[in-house]
């Protein structure tokens, strides 16, 4: 069986979200009339959290490679492309370790 095209899902997404918001709005009005606002506020905050996480997930799906490309540049350097490979050896630190430690009085 043919798999659904990803674009079809994205085209149906706004209608689904608007339908869910419409349903939530009518439920909000019913609960407003019954004065049960704690449940409504909880549902609104939960919906906000879910929509925010969904938005972050979708944005990462679209722009994740671009963001990763900004931080990781393959090349001669080490991690993130800015540190040379031989920089893990710090001879100045080794020489400083051999010196006697100075106190604040000296």
UniProtKB/Swiss-Prot annotation:
Residues 2-8, 65-106 are extracellular. It is found in: Membrane. Keywords: Acetylation, Glycoprotein, Membrane, Transmembrane, Transmembrane helix. It is a multi-pass membrane protein. The chain crosses the membrane at residues 9-29, 44-64. It holds the Pfam family T_cell_tran_alt. The keyword Membrane applies. Glycans are attached at residue 80. GO terms for biological process: negative regulation of osteoclast differentiation; osteoclast fusion. The modification N-acetylalanine is found at residue 2. Its main location: membrane. This is T-cell leukemia translocation-altered gene protein homolog. It comes from Rattus norvegicus (Rat). The lineage of its organism: Eukaryota, Metazoa, Chordata, Craniata, Vertebrata.
């Amino acid at each position: 069986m043919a798999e659904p095209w990803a674009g079809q899902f994205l085209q149906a997404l706004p209608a689904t979200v608007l339908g869910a918001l419409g349903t939530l709005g009518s439920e909000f009005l019913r609960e407003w009339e019954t004065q049960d606002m704690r449940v409504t506020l909880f549902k609104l905050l939960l919906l906000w959290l879910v929509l925010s996480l969904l938005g972050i997930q979708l944005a990462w799906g679209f722009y994740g490679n671009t963001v990763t490309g900004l931080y990781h540049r393959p090349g001669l350097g080490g991690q993130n492309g800015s540190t040379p490979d031989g920089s893990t050896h710090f001879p100045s630190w080794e020489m400083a370790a051999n010196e006697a430690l100075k106190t604040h009085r000296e």
